[in-house]
UniProtKB/Swiss-Prot annotation:
Keywords: ATP-binding, Nucleotide-binding. Residues 521-783 form the Protein kinase domain. GO terms for biological process: signal transduction. Residues 26-43, 61-73, 154-175, 301-324, 362-376, 392-402, 485-498, 791-828 have a biased composition (Low complexity). GO terms for molecular function: ATP binding; protein kinase activity. The protein kinase domain is predicted to be catalytically inactive. It comes from Dictyostelium discoideum (Social amoeba). SMART domains: ARM. This is Probable inactive serine/threonine-protein kinase DDB_G0280131.
Length: 1192
C-alpha cells in the first residue's frame, strides 16, 4: 500500500493548498510531499509559491477567491478522498478511480489552467506578436530535462494568473492603502519567493506628442525615480515593450492549442530568437539630476509610483480616478505588465511606466512605416463596462543617444525573425480540414516539419483508365492499322505538333526548375530493367548514392498530375519504404531518383534461407512488407507492381519497398504491351498481377483499387514458403489473360498462414483482407499462429484431387477445418465466411476472459486502456507523459499484470515506445522489464511483436540510462534454460556484434552488465560460434589481463568459461601473446580463497589449457599441486571439481619432464586415499596417475 499512501499524501497536499488559495510547485521533484511551503527538505529544487492578498476593512489579509475550475477540481478531490479508510465513510480508497478521474478531459483542462507545473503548450500567435509569445513562454514549464535546461523560467511565474473575482469592481484612491512589502526570502537551500503585488497604475500610450504640454508636478509627490540600468548579463525575466503605441492594447488572435506546434524545433528556435530580441533591449540609464531633458509622454492624472531596484510601491492620491484591480510586477527594464487573463490563451496587456517612450514594435499585422507616419485615431480598448476616461498629464522622460541604436537593432532583428520563420504556419485556418489524418502503422515515429506535413496532407488524385484508348485498341479495325493511321495523322501535322511539344517541354522544364525535388539526370551504368523502364546509377546527391529510373511511354498530358504525385511521394516517410529523392522531366523523358541500397532482392534471400529459422524470418519480412503497404494505402497510394524485384533487403535483412505509386504510367505501359503482339512477350512478373487488372485490359467494365496489392502479397507469401518453387513454373490455365495456377500444399507453412494466403489470392477483391488486418495477424505470437493443426495426409490428398478436377475459381470451396471431413457440397461463400470468422478469432487471441479475475477491476482497467489509447492518438508531450505515468502506476502492482495482458496494454506500450522522447522510451523499457519479469506469456508476446528489434535500436542509444535498461531486458530474455528461442532471435537480429562493440564503453557498470548479458547468451551453441567468429574472445582476454577488480574478474571469467572449451578458443589463447598472462590470471583465481566461484572458474579454465606444453611449465613453476590439494579430499562430496583436478594432474603426469615435480610434491598420499573412492572413474584416474608417477 506504499504507492497508495504516496498518492494519497500528494492528493491531500494539493487539496489543502487549493483550499488555502495557493498552489505550490516543485519544478524538479514532482513526487515529493508539499504540505508546508516554507519547510526546507534538503533538496536543491527551487519552489515558487503564488500568494496574493488584499487588505480588508479591518486591516487583515484574506486570500483571493478561487476560480470555478479550482473549486470543481477541489470538490472532485474531496469526493475521492472521502472514500479513504481514515475518514468516517466506508468503502476505502481506489487508485483506479483516481487514475480515471485524473485522465479525464476536464481534469486535463483544469490542470493546465490551475497548475503551472504541468507541461503546457508552447504556442506562437497567428501574427507572431512578440508580447503574446513572451506570455506563453513565461507560463511554460518543461518536465523534460533537456528542454528545461534550454529554456529559463521567468519571474512572471511568481504571479497569480487567476482573474479578479469581480472585474467590474473598482478601487478609489480614498480607501486604497499602501500594501506591506513582502518579507525577504529565507536563507535556505530551497528559495521560496512570495509575491504580494500592489495594484498597478493604468497608463495609456498615445502617438507621438501633438497635444499641449502640461507642467511637471512637484518632485516631492510625483517625481519619477528610475531604476539603475540592469547588469550586462542577461537575466531570466526580461520583459518586452508593447506591440503598438498608437492603437492601444491590441486584441491578439491565437492559435488553438490543438493546432499549436508543440515542442518542435521551429518553436524552440523561434523562442531562442525571441530571447535574443528581448536581451537586445538593454537597460534604461539612470537620469543625471536635472541635466537630462525629459521627453513628453501622456499619462493619467494618477501619479506614477516610485520604482526602485529592490522594492515596488505605489503612492496614494486624492484624485477620484479609478483603476482595475489587477496584478502587476516590475521587470528589469522598468515595465509594469498587467495580466487580466483568466486562462492561458487570453491576450496580454503590457503597459509601460518607465520614463522612456517605447519604440513601436512592428509585427506581421502592424502597418508599414509609410502608413504609420500618417496620423490615425487611436482605437478604443474594449472594457467590460463603459467607464469615463481619466484626465491626462504630460510627463517628460530623458532621452539617451543609445536608444536609436537599440531601436535600429530591434527592427533588424524583427525583420530577420520574419524571414527565418516565414515557413511556419501562421494560422490554423491554413490547415486543410478535409485532409486525412496521418496514421502511422509502423513501429517507428518520424517527426515531420510543417512543410512535410502540408505535403502529406494532400490527397492523391484518383486516376481512371483511359477507356477511349482501350476501345480504339479493342475496336473492329486491326491493331496494326490503328497504329498506322495514328502515325499518318501525326505526320500530317508534324510541324505544328513538334512546335507544340517543344513549347510544352520548355514550359515543363521551367516549372520543375523551381521545385525542391528537381534533380538533374546524370545516367551511368545500367543496373537492370523491368516492365516500366530502365534503372541506372546516377551519382551522388546530398552525400548519398542514388539511382535513376527512366519510365517508358510517358505522355505530356500526364505531367501536371505527376507533379502533384511527386510532391506527395517525396514527403512520405516509413522505415521500410525506399523514399523518393526527386524527379525530372528532361528531353521528354520522365526520371525518378531513389537512394542506392547495397543488398539483394527478396528472391535471393528466400532461396538462401536457413531451415531452422525459416518461419521466424518469413514472418518478420512479411510483417515489414505489410507495414509498408498499409502505410501507402493510408494515403490511397497503390503500388500495382509488388513483386520480389521491387523488394530490397540490406545487409541487416531490413525490407525496403521501391517503385511504388505512378499507377497511371504503369497502366499505360501494361496496356501497350498487353494489346501489342510484339510487346506482349516482354511482360514480366505477370503471376503477381491480380485478375481485375486483366479484366480492365481486356475491355471489361470496372477498375481496381488497393486490393490488387493484397493479391500480389499473397503470391509473395506463398513463394516465401515454397522457396525454390515459383508460381509461374506450376501447371496453369489461362482465362481472359489471367493465369490460374494449381498451387500444391506447403508442408512447412502453418495452417493459419495458409488460410491467410487463400484469402489474399481470392479472385473476388472484396474477399481479400486489408493490410491492416494482415498486419495484425502477422504480429500475433508465434504459438498463436501455430496453434491450428494442419490437415492430415488423407485430407491433403483429397485437396489435391479436388484441385485437379475443379476449376481454380472453386478452389476456395475446399475445407478449412482441421477436424473431421466436411461436406463436399459446401458453397464457396460459406467456406469463405468460415475463414473470415476464424481470422476474426485469430485477430483477438488475448480477448479471453479469466473467470478468476475481478469483473469490476477488469472494467476499470479496460476504461483506463481506452483513455490511454485516446491520449496516444493525440501524441502531444503532455498526453504521452500522462499515458506513460498511468501505465507505470498499473505495472507497479504485480496483481494487475493479468488484467493488463487481457486489456492489450502491451501493444499500447509499443506505441509509446515509437515516440522520439527519451523519457517516454525509458519509461516504456522499465514497464517491459517489470512485465517480463513476472509473466512468461508477456515475454513471448514481446518477442513475437518484434520487441527485440526495438532493443537492437536502443542498444545504439547515447543515453546511458536507456542503454542500461536495454541490457537488463536482454539479460531477462536470455536467463534460463528454456530461453533458447529468445537467444536465437537476439542472434538473428544482430545483437552479438552490437554487444561486442559496447565492450569498450567507458562506463564500467555498463561493461559489467554487457558481460553478464553475454554470459547468458553464450549458453547457446550458435551464439558461441558467432561470438568467436566476430573476435569477441580477444576483447574478453584483453579485459581479463587488465582487470584489478574481483567483481570484474568474475564476470569476464564467467563469459570466457562458456567458450573456453572450444578447440578454436584454446588455440587462440595458446598461440596468442596473452598466453602467459592468461594462465597466471587463472592461477590467481584458483588461489583466491575468498570467492569459491572464482576458484571454480579458474580450475575449469586451467583444465582446458593444461594440454599446452608451455602452459604446463607455468603451472609447475607456480606449484599447481598445492592449489589442487583441497579438491583431493576423499570425504568431499563435490565430484566435478575432484575430477577436474585429477584431469590436470593426469595430463602433467603423462609428460616425463614433470614426473620429478609430482614426486616431490605431497600428492602421493592423497591419491592413495582416493583409490577407495566409490566412483569408478575417479578410481581409474588415480590408478593411472600412480602408475605413471611410479614407473618413471
Amino acid at each position: 500500500m506504499s504507492e497508495l499512501d504516496d498518492l494519497l499524501n500528494e492528493m491531500l497536499a494539493e487539496s489543502e493548498a487549493a483550499l488555502n488559495g495557493q498552489s505550490t510547485i516543485n519544478l524538479n521533484n514532482n513526487n515529493s510531499n508539499n504540505n508546508n511551503n516554507n519547510n526546507n527538505n534538503g533538496n536543491s529544487a527551487t519552489k515558487i509559491s503564488f500568494q496574493e492578498q488584499m487588505p480588508n476593512g479591518n486591516g487583515n489579509s484574506s486570500t483571493t477567491t478561487t476560480t470555478a475550475a479550482q473549486q470543481s477540481a477541489t470538490e472532485k478531490r474531496k469526493s475521492r478522498l472521502s472514500q479513504h479508510p481514515s475518514n468516517l465513510n466506508e468503502g476505502g480508497f481506489d487508485y483506479l478511480d483516481t487514475l480515471l478521474n485524473d485522465m479525464s478531459d476536464e481534469s486535463i483542462r483544469n490542470s493546465i489552467k490551475t497548475d503551472n507545473s504541468r507541461i503546457k503548450s508552447l504556442r506562437l500567435t497567428s501574427t507572431f506578436d512578440l508580447e503574446s509569445t513572451l506570455k506563453d513562454l513565461e507560463e511554460t514549464f518543461m518536465k523534460d530535462s533537456s528542454i528545461q535546461n534550454k529554456r529559463k523560467p521567468s519571474s512572471y511565474l511568481s504571479k497569480n494568473l487567476s482573474p479578479p473575482s469581480n472585474p467590474s469592481n473598482i478601487i478609489s484612491n480614498n480607501n486604497a492603502s499602501t500594501l506591506p512589502l513582502p518579507p525577504p526570502p529565507s536563507q535556505q537551500d530551497d528559495v521560496v519567493i512570495i509575491a504580494k503585488l500592489p495594484p498597478p497604475v493604468s497608463i495609456s500610450l498615445p502617438p507621438p506628442p501633438t497635444t499641449e504640454e502640461l507642467p511637471l508636478p512637484p518632485p516631492s509627490t510625483e517625481e519619477l525615480q528610475l531604476p539603475p540600468p540592469p547588469p550586462t548579463t542577461t537575466t531570466a525575466d526580461e520583459q518586452i515593450l508593447t506591440d503598438s503605441v498608437k492603437n492601444g492594447n491590441p486584441i491578439l488572435k491565437r492559435v488553438s492549442s490543438e493546432r499549436a506546434i508543440i515542442l518542435t524545433k521551429e518553436a524552440i528556435d523561434a523562442a531562442d530568437l525571441l530571447d535574443e530580441m528581448i536581451e537586445s533591449f538593454g537597460g534604461i540609464p539612470e537620469p543625471n539630476g536635472n541635466n537630462s531633458l525629459p521627453k513628453e509622454i501622456k499619462t493619467t492624472s494618477i501619479p506614477t509610483p516610485i520604482v526602485t531596484p529592490s522594492t515596488t510601491t505605489s503612492t496614494n492620491t486624492t484624485t477620484a480616478a479609478t483603476v482595475n484591480k489587477l496584478n502587476a510586477s516590475k521587470s528589469p527594464n522598468g515595465t509594469l505588465t498587467t495580466r487580466p487573463a483568466a486562462k492561458l490563451g487570453a491576450p496580454v496587456d503590457i503597459q509601460v511606466s518607465s520614463p522612456k517612450a517605447p519604440t513601436p514594435i512592428p509585427t506581421l499585422s502592424s502597418p508599414s512605416p509609410s502608413q504609420s507616419a500618417a496620423p490615425q485615431p487611436a482605437a478604443p480598448q474594449p472594457t467590460p463596462t463603459s467607464q469615463p476616461q481619466p484626465p491626462t498629464t504630460t510627463v517628460s522622460t530623458p532621452v539617451s543617444p543609445t536608444f536609436k541604436d537599440s531601436d535600429q537593432l530591434l527592427d533588424d532583428m524583427i525583420s530577420h525573425f520574419k524571414e527565418s520563420n516565414s515557413n511556419l504556419l501562421t494560422s490554423s485556418s491554413n490547415l486543410d480540414p478535409s485532409a486525412p489524418k496521418v496514421v502511422y502503422t509502423s513501429q517507428q515515429f518520424y517527426p515531420l516539419s510543417v512543410e512535410e506535413q502540408s505535403l502529406q496532407s494532400k490527397v492523391k488524385v484518383q486516376l481512371t483508365p483511359d477507356e477511349q484508348v482501350i476501345q480504339k485498341i479493342l475496336g473492329n479495325n486491326d491493331l496494326d492499322d490503328d497504329i498506322t493511321n495514328k502515325n499518318n495523322d501525326n505526320n500530317s501535322n508534324g510541324n505544328n505538333n513538334n512546335k507544340e511539344l517543344i513549347d510544352e517541354q520548355n514550359q515543363i522544364e521551367q516549372q520543375q526548375s523551381d521545385k525542391s525535388w528537381y534533380i538533374k539526370a546524370q545516367p551511368s551504368d545500367i543496373i537492370g530493367s523491368g516492365n516500366n523502364g530502365t534503372t541506372q546509377r546516377a551519382g551522388i546527391h546530398k552525400d548519398k548514392r542514388i539511382v535513376m529510373k527512366q519510365w517508358n511511354f510517358i505522355t505530356s498530358q500526364a505531367t501536371p498530375m505527376l507533379f502533384n504525385e511527386i510532391e506527395q511521394l517525396v514527403a512520405i516517410k516509413h522505415p521500410n519504404i525506399l523514399a523518393l529523392a526527386g524527379a525530372s522531366f528532361d528531353n521528354q523523358t520522365f526520371t525518378t531518383f531513389t537512394e542506392y541500397i547495397t543488398g539483394s532482392n527478396l528472391d535471393i534471400v528466400i532461396k538462401n534461407l536457413d531451415e531452422k529459422n525459416e518461419l521466424q524470418l518469413i514472418l518478420r519480412l512479411s510483417e515489414e512488407i505489410a507495414s509498408a503497404m498499409s502505410f501507402l494505402h493510408s494515403f490511397n497510394i497503390v503500388h500495382r507492381s509488388l513483386h520480389p524485384k521491387n523488394i530490397l533487403l540490406n545487409s541487416d535483412l531490413k525490407i525496403y519497398i521501391k517503385d511504388y505509386g505512378f499507377t497511371s504510367l504503369k497502366d499505360e505501359t501494361l496496356k501497350k504491351k498487353f494489346m501489342s503482339f510484339q510487346l506482349k512477350n516482354q511482360l514480366l512478373h505477370t503471376q503477381y498481377l491480380a485478375p481485375e487488372l486483366f479484366n480492365v485490359l481486356s475491355g471489361s467494365k470496372g477498375g481496381y483499387d488497393t486490393k490488387v496489392d493484397v493479391f500480389s502479397f499473397g503470391v509473395l507469401l506463398w513463394e516465401m514458403f515454397a522457396r525454390d518453387i515459383k508460381l509461374s513454373d506450376l501447371k496453369s490455365n489461362t482465362v481472359n489473360g489471367y493465369t490460374h495456377y494449381l498451387r500444391p500444399p506447403l508442408p512447412n507453412c502453418p495452417f493459419t498462414i495458409e488460410k491467410l494466403i487463400k484469402l489474399c489470392l481470392s479472385t473476388d477483391p472484396s474477399v481479400r483482407p486489408t493490410f491492416t488486418t494482415i498486419l495484425k495477424i502477422l504480429r500475433q505470437p508465434l504459438h498463436t499462429i501455430q496453434r491450428f493443426n494442419k490437415p492430415t495426409q488423407q485430407q491433403q490428398q483429397q485437396q489435391q484431387q479436388d484441385q485437379q478436377q475443379q476449376q481454380p475459381e472453386q478452389q476456395l470451396t475446399s475445407s478449412t477445418s482441421s477436424t473431421s471431413t466436411q461436406d463436399s457440397l459446401v458453397s464457396q461463400e460459406q467456406v469463405e465466411e468460415k475463414i473470415k470468422n476464424e481470422m476474426n478469432n485469430l485477430l483477438n487471441p488475448n480477448k479471453r476472459f479469466n473467470e478468476s479475475l475481478d469483473p469490476e477491476k477488469r472494467v476499470k482497467i479496460e476504461k483506463i486502456a481506452n483513455v490511454v489509447k485516446d491520449l496516444i492518438s493525440q501524441p502531444t508531450l503532455l498526453n504521452l507523459h500522462r499515458a506513460s505515468q498511468t501505465i507505470d502506476q498499473l505495472c507497479k502492482n504485480v496483481e494487475n499484470i493479468e488484467y493488463l495482458l487481457e486489456a492489450d496494454f502491451v501493444p499500447l506500450i509499443f506505441q509509446l515506445m515509437d515516440q522520439p522522447y527519451d523519457e517516454i522510451q525509458l519509461s516504456c523499457l522499465k514497464q517491459f522489464s517489470t512485465l517480463i519479469e513476472h509473466n512468461e506469456e508477456i515475454m513471448n508476446l514481446f518477442r513475437n511483436l518484434l520487441g527485440i528489434n526495438i532493443l537492437m535500436e536502443t542498444l545504439n542509444s547515447q543515453k546511458e540510462n536507456i542503454l542500461f535498461i536495454t541490457l537488463r531486458l536482454l539479460s531477462q530474455l536470455s536467463n534460463g534454460a528454456d530461453r533458447e528461442e529468445n537467444r536465437e532471435q537476439i542472434l538473428i537480429k544482430g545483437g552479438i556484434p552490437l554487444l561486442i562493440n559496447l565492450l569498450s564503453h567507458q562506463n564500467e557498470l555498463i561493461r559489467l552488465q554487457i558481460l553478464w548479458c553475454l554470459t547468458l547468451l553464450l549458453e547457446s551453441n550458435s551464439v558461441q560460434v558467432e561470438f568467436v567468429k566476430l573476435g569477441g574472445v580477444n576483447q574478453l582476454l584483453d579485459m581479463m589481463v587488465h582487470s584489478i577488480n574481483s567483481g570484474f574478474d568474475l564476470r569476464v571469467a564467467s563469459a570466457l568459461a562458456r567458450v573456453i572449451s572450444l578447440k578454436s578458443v584454446q588455440d587462440q589463447i595458446n598461440l596468442g601473446h596473452y598466453r602467459e598472462r592468461v594462465v597466471k590470471k587463472y592461477l590467481s583465481l584458483l588461489g583466491d580463497t575468498q570467492f569459491e566461484a572464482l576458484r571454480m572458474l579458474g580450475l575449469e579454465a586451467i583444465a582446458c589449457l593444461v594440454s599446452n606444453k608451455d602452459s604446463q611449465f607455468i603451472l609447475t613453476a607456480s606449484n599447481i599441486v598445492d592449489l589442487l590439494l583441497s579438491y583431493l579430499d576423499p570425504n568431499s562430496t563435490s565430484m566435478a571439481p575432484q575430477m577436474t583436478a585429477l584431469k590436470i594432474i593426469l595430463v602433467l603426469s603423462v609428460n616425463p619432464i614433470h614426473i620429478p615435480y609430482l614426486k616431490s610434491s605431497n600428492i602421493i598420499e592423497p591419491l592413495q586415499y582416493l583409490k577407495s573412492s566409490p566412483h569408478p572413474s575417479i578410481q581409474k584416474a588415480v590408478e593411472k596417475i600412480l602408475m605413471l608417477v611410479s614407473s618413471k
